Amino acid sequence: MPNKALITGFWSKVKVDEVGAEALGRLLVVYPWTQRFFEHFGDLSSADAVLGNAKVKAHGKKVLDSFSNGVQHLDDLKGTFAELSELHCDKLHVDPENFRLLGNVLVIVLARHFGKEFTPELQAEFQKVVAGVASALAHRYH
């Protein structure tokens, strides 16, 4: 179980719009096969196009708003993400491996934004959180 006080205290400093936009953008650039779920977002032809795309930025914020809700409900991640798990499984048919990839990208983006403040201890706690969120989002698939 992650250290709730450490996670929530740190998370209050995160600029969800910036970090969300960068995390989703990086996912789409580093793992280009994930772009197939976002073809309706327009130009995703290059890293600059992806990172500058307003729809990518807006959806990245939406993703991190949901993650923020999870941070507030660490004791019930499955319940917190039940509807999103159903949506991504039954309607969108997203490969659940993508949740793990996005979680790892999020940790990288947090480290980039916070530098030395994102200590190894904090990273270890966030790895637990992103693994828990990925598992909760993949729950419907099992």
From Swiss-Prot:
InterPro entries per record: Globin (IPR000971), Globin-like_sf (IPR009050), Globin/Proto (IPR012292), Hemoglobin_b (IPR002337), Hemoglobin_oxygen_transport (IPR050056)
Q: Function, please?
A: Involved in oxygen transport from the lung to the various peripheral tissues.
Organism taxonomic ancestry:
Eukaryota, Metazoa, Chordata, Craniata, Vertebrata
User: What are the protein's UniProt keywords?
Assistant: Heme, Iron, Metal-binding, Oxygen transport, Transport
Q: Name one Pfam family in it.
A: Globin
One GO process term, biological-process aspect: hydrogen peroxide catabolic process
SUPFAM superfamilies linked: Globin-like
Q: Name one GO molecular function term.
A: haptoglobin binding
Q: Does the keyword Transport apply?
A: yes
Q: Which GO terms describe its cellular component?
A: blood microparticle; haptoglobin-hemoglobin complex; hemoglobin complex
Family, according to the entry, reads as follows: Belongs to the globin family.
What more does the entry say?
A: This type of beta-C chain is found when anemia has been experimentally produced.
Q: What is this protein identified as?
A: Hemoglobin subunit beta-C
Positions with a binding annotation for heme b: H59, H88
Gene3D superfamilies, sorted: Globins
Q: How does it assemble?
A: Heterotetramer of two alpha chains and two beta chains.
Which source organism does the UniProt entry give?
Capra hircus (Goat)
Cite the record's tissue specificity text.
Red blood cells.
Keyword Transport annotated? yes
Q: What positions does the domain Globin occupy? A: 1-142
